[in-house]
Design a protein with these regions (language model features):
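Conserved Nudix-box catalytic region and its N-terminal flanking loop in Nudix hydrolases
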Residues: 24-66
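Acidic, metal-coordinating catalytic segment for phosphate/diphosphate chemistry
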Residues: 1-19, 25, 90, 157
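Short, well-ordered beta-strand micro-motif
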Residues: 22, 101-103, 126-128
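A generic structural micro-feature
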Residues: 12-14, 88-96, 116-121
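A short coil-to-beta-strand element that immediately follows conserved catalytic motifs
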Residues: 67-76
Length: 162
C-alpha cells in the first residue's frame, strides 16, 4: 500500500500535494463533489518515495481516465487554511502543492470514475477561464495566474484560515 506524504499532529494537518493545471479550449478542468460547495484542482497527495511529477500524472489519470503529459512546473503553492466540516474539521491545515501545467490534448473528452477518500463520486467540470471568478474554486490564485501565466516557476503563499 502506498502512503501519502501527509500527517496530523495534535490539531495540525500537513500534506504534500501534486496538482494539475489542465486547459483545453480556454477552459480549465476542475473537480467537485456533492459534499463540498466549491471546486478544486485535479490532483492529490504525493506518495512516499514518489516524485511530484509521477504523482501528478498518476492523479490526473486516476481522476480523469486520461493520460496527460507534463508541460512544466508552473506554481509552488504554500497554503494555510482550515475547514468547518469533513475530515479536516477543526484542524489547522498546511499544504504544499506543486502545480504542473499539462500539455493540451486538443479535446475535452474524459473517462472519469473518481471518488473522494470518503467514497463520494467526483464530477469533472470544464470552466471557461474567463468565468473562473464566478465560481468558488480553489486554489484562489487560479484566475489571476491564468490571466497572466508566467514562463518561470511562481511561488505563491496563501493564508485562508478563518
Amino acid at each position: 500500500m502506498d502512503y501519502d506524504c501527509c500527517f496530523t499532529k495534535e490539531k495540525n494537518w500537513f500534506r504534500y500535494r501534486a496538482a494539475a493545471i489542465i486547459i483545453e479550449d480556454d477552459c480549465m478542468l476542475l473537480v467537485g463533489n456533492s459534499n463540498e460547495d466549491y471546486l478544486y484542482s485535479v490532483g492529490g497527495g504525493v506518495h512516499m518515495n514518489e516524485s511530484s511529477q509521477d504523482a501528478v500524472k498518476r492523479e490526473v489519470f486516476e481522476e480523469t481516465g486520461v493520460h496527460y503529459e507534463i508541460d512544466r512546473l508552473a506554481v509552488v503553492h504554500e497554503n494555510f487554511f482550515n475547514e468547518n466540516n469533513g475530515f479536516l474539521k477543526n484542524l489547522e491545515c498546511h499544504e504544499i502543492s506543486f502545480y504542473y501545467l499539462m500539455k493540451p490534448k486538443g479535446n475535452q473528452e474524459l473517462f472519469s470514475n473518481s471518488y473522494t477518500r470518503g467514497g463520494t463520486k467526483e464530477e469533472m467540470y470544464w470552466i471557461p477561464i474567463s468565468d473562473l471568478d464566478k465560481y468558488k474554486a480553489f486554489p484562489t490564485f487560479l484566475k489571476s495566474y491564468l490571466s497572466e501565466p508566467k514562463q518561470e516557476v511562481t511561488h505563491i503563499v496563501t493564508d485562508e484560515r478563518i
